[in-house]
């Protein structure tokens, strides 16, 4: 049993040899794609930040790293949805976005960052533009 426990422990808690060699190649191999990918993500980031800052009640700072933004929805807290529900917090806001516009976001409280919410920009420019337009429309409908 002791030997089986050791084998099982090593099998599930350690990185496999093939994964280790793949990581070595990824780190030491051709890096030419990184600059072009960085540029694409900067363009997507800038698009999302700009469009979210145009939405009523939202403010979005430009992140330095990662592939997501954390806009503040403090400006929509206390507002009413078209069906009369009051947005009381960031969780209410992301539920409202999902239910009315089909846009999925994560409420900031899940990360200890209320009243913010998290949006990934690791999607195509077309999808991001559409999602941001939907968010703008949802914010404009609040009173």
Locate each region found by the language model.
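PLP-dependent class I/II
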Residues: 1-143
């Amino acid at each position: 049993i002791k030997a089986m426990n050791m084998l099982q422990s090593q099998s599930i808690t350690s990185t496999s040899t093939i994964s280790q060699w793949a990581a070595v190649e990824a780190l030491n191999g051709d890096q030419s794609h990184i600059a072009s990918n960085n540029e694409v993500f900067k363009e997507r980031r800038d698009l999302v930040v700009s469009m979210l800052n145009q939405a009523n009640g939202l403010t979005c700072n430009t992140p330095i790293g990662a592939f997501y933004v954390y806009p503040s929805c403090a400006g929509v807290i206390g507002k009413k949805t078209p069906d009369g529900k009051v947005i009381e917090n960031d969780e209410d806001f992301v539920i409202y976005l999902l239910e009315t516009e089909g846009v999925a976001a994560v409420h900031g409280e899940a990360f200890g960052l209320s009243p913010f919410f998290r949006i990934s920009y690791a999607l195509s420019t077309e999808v991001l533009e559409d999602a941001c337009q939907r968010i703008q429309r949802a914010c404009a409908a609040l009173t």
